[in-house]
Amino acid sequence: MTKKGNMRNTINNIVILTGAGVSAESGVATFRGPDGLWEGHRVEDVATPEAFVRDPDLVQKFYDERRAKLKTVEPNAAHQALAKLDKTWAGELLLVTQNVDDLHERAGSKRLLHMHGELNSAWCRACDAHFA
């Protein structure tokens, strides 16, 4: 960088990592913490293929509750700002999120990777079908 504030002239590639904090501002509960989504559930009981085999109703209920809550929240200023950067940045940009919600997409982000999957999509191990 030759001058302060001249970053756009020297930086072409950006990778951004977001986590629970960005969606918590919209009212999405985090997985950890005193009121987190894991409270009252062991990860092994709701978030593994083995859990689904053992108790598919519990797993389905757990995720149905998360999906229902997601319908009641909206992207916040952080989601909007990242979507604007995605739209206007001429270079390469990748937004990597640890979140399973769709708030980045709803804000308009296109160059996005979900590290832990997406709450609104599923994959069948038996037939390799994808559901959204």
Whereabouts are the PLM-identified features?
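Conserved catalytic core of sirtuin-type NAD+-dependent deacylases
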Residues: T2-A132
